[in-house]
């Protein structure tokens, strides 16, 4: 199947002077030695810088810790894969037969890595100004989202504020089980709220993480 790279360029709103950069950025290691791994390394740093710079300028009153959490939220793998899906990136990847059969074009890690590689390709082809322009275009709806700062609050804090605003009782977290070897334990936590029928569960490598995941699950249930 022939891959139409011009269509992807239109979706990116960027025309490559050297299309070889884009081809390499779309090539998974399973498809050849000239793959996107080195591009991914470079793209990760470019993305981190551009987002950090944008957040620094947009939020002059935020602390270093707040800016770091916002950046981490915006450049995490799940977010990158989400953006990649929005532009249909999976349709343009060059994958080996094994990855193709196993659905690699849908895999979060592959989509995230490929998007970072494309950002590096744009930088190598058109410089930092071009890369910054494309990054800010891809992230525009997220950077402009009035709820962006909600990610500064952890799930337990968000759940508590939601319950207080809704006049509910505060949640109770119960450690129900610890399993696994001492160096690789898994903690199981249950979250319940008096007067609320829903029950939420969380598992993690420590109690704090398990409680956060249980709180997140409960909040998602309550908010429907």
UniProtKB/Swiss-Prot annotation:
<dbReference type="GO" id="GO:0008033">
    <property type="term" value="P:tRNA processing"/>
</dbReference>
<dbReference type="InterPro" id="IPR000999">
    <property type="entry name" value="RNase_III_dom"/>
</dbReference>
<dbReference type="GO" id="GO:0006364">
    <property type="term" value="P:rRNA processing"/>
</dbReference>
<feature type="active site">
    <location>
        <position position="116"/>
    </location>
</feature>
<dbReference type="GO" id="GO:0004525">
    <property type="term" value="F:ribonuclease III activity"/>
</dbReference>
<keyword id="KW-0460">Magnesium</keyword>
<dbReference type="GO" id="GO:0005737">
    <property type="term" value="C:cytoplasm"/>
</dbReference>
<keyword id="KW-0694">RNA-binding</keyword>
<keyword id="KW-0699">rRNA-binding</keyword>
<keyword id="KW-0479">Metal-binding</keyword>
<feature type="domain" description="DRBM">
    <location>
        <begin position="154"/>
        <end position="224"/>
    </location>
</feature>
<dbReference type="InterPro" id="IPR014720">
    <property type="entry name" value="dsRBD_dom"/>
</dbReference>
<keyword id="KW-0507">mRNA processing</keyword>
<dbReference type="GO" id="GO:0003725">
    <property type="term" value="F:double-stranded RNA binding"/>
</dbReference>
<feature type="binding site">
    <location>
        <position position="116"/>
    </location>
    <ligand>
        <name>Mg(2+)</name>
    </ligand>
</feature>
<comment type="subunit">
    <text>Homodimer.</text>
</comment>
<keyword id="KW-0963">Cytoplasm</keyword>
<protein>
    <recommendedName>
        <fullName>Ribonuclease 3</fullName>
        <ecNumber>3.1.26.3</ecNumber>
    </recommendedName>
</protein>
<feature type="active site">
    <location>
        <position position="44"/>
    </location>
</feature>
<dbReference type="Pfam" id="PF00035">
    <property type="entry name" value="dsrm"/>
</dbReference>
<feature type="binding site">
    <location>
        <position position="40"/>
    </location>
    <ligand>
        <name>Mg(2+)</name>
    </ligand>
</feature>
<dbReference type="GO" id="GO:0006397">
    <property type="term" value="P:mRNA processing"/>
</dbReference>
<keyword id="KW-0378">Hydrolase</keyword>
<keyword id="KW-0698">rRNA processing</keyword>
<keyword id="KW-0540">Nuclease</keyword>
<comment type="similarity">
    <text>Belongs to the ribonuclease III family.</text>
</comment>
<dbReference type="GO" id="GO:0010468">
    <property type="term" value="P:regulation of gene expression"/>
</dbReference>
<dbReference type="GO" id="GO:0046872">
    <property type="term" value="F:metal ion binding"/>
</dbReference>
<keyword id="KW-0819">tRNA processing</keyword>
<dbReference type="Pfam" id="PF14622">
    <property type="entry name" value="Ribonucleas_3_3"/>
</dbReference>
<dbReference type="InterPro" id="IPR011907">
    <property type="entry name" value="RNase_III"/>
</dbReference>
<feature type="binding site">
    <location>
        <position position="113"/>
    </location>
    <ligand>
        <name>Mg(2+)</name>
    </ligand>
</feature>
<dbReference type="InterPro" id="IPR036389">
    <property type="entry name" value="RNase_III_sf"/>
</dbReference>
<dbReference type="GO" id="GO:0019843">
    <property type="term" value="F:rRNA binding"/>
</dbReference>
<keyword id="KW-0255">Endonuclease</keyword>
<comment type="function">
    <text>Digests double-stranded RNA. Involved in the processing of primary rRNA transcript to yield the immediate precursors to the large and small rRNAs (23S and 16S). Processes some mRNAs, and tRNAs when they are encoded in the rRNA operon. Processes pre-crRNA and tracrRNA of type II CRISPR loci if present in the organism.</text>
</comment>
<feature type="domain" description="RNase III">
    <location>
        <begin position="5"/>
        <end position="127"/>
    </location>
</feature>
């Amino acid at each position: 199947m022939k891959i139409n790279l011009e269509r992807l360029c239109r979706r990116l709103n960027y025309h490559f002077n050297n299309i070889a950069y884009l081809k390499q950025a779309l090539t998974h290691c399973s498809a050849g030695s000239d793959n996107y791994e080195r591009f991914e390394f470079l793209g990760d740093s470019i993305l981190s810088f551009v987002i950090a710079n944008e957040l620094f300028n947009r939020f002059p009153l935020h602390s270093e810790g707040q800016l770091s959490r916002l950046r981490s939220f915006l450049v995490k793998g799940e977010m990158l894969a989400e953006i990649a899906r929005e532009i249909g990136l999976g349709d343009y990847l060059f994958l080996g037969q094994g990855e193709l059969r196993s659905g690699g074009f849908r895999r979060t890690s592959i989509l995230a890595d490929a998007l970072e590689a494309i950002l590096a390709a744009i930088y190598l082809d058109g410089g930092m100004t071009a890369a910054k322009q494309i990054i800010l275009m891809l992230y525009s709806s997220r950077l402009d989202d009035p709820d962006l700062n909600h990610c500064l609050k952890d799930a337990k804090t968000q759940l508590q504020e939601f319950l207080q605003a809704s006049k509910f009782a505060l949640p109770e977290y119960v450690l129900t089980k610890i399993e696994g070897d001492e160096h690789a334990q898994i903690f199981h936590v249950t979250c319940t709220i008096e007067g609320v029928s829903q029950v939420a569960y969380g598992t993690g490598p420590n109690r704090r993480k398990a409680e956060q995941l249980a709180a997140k699950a409960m909040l998602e249930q309550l908010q429907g």
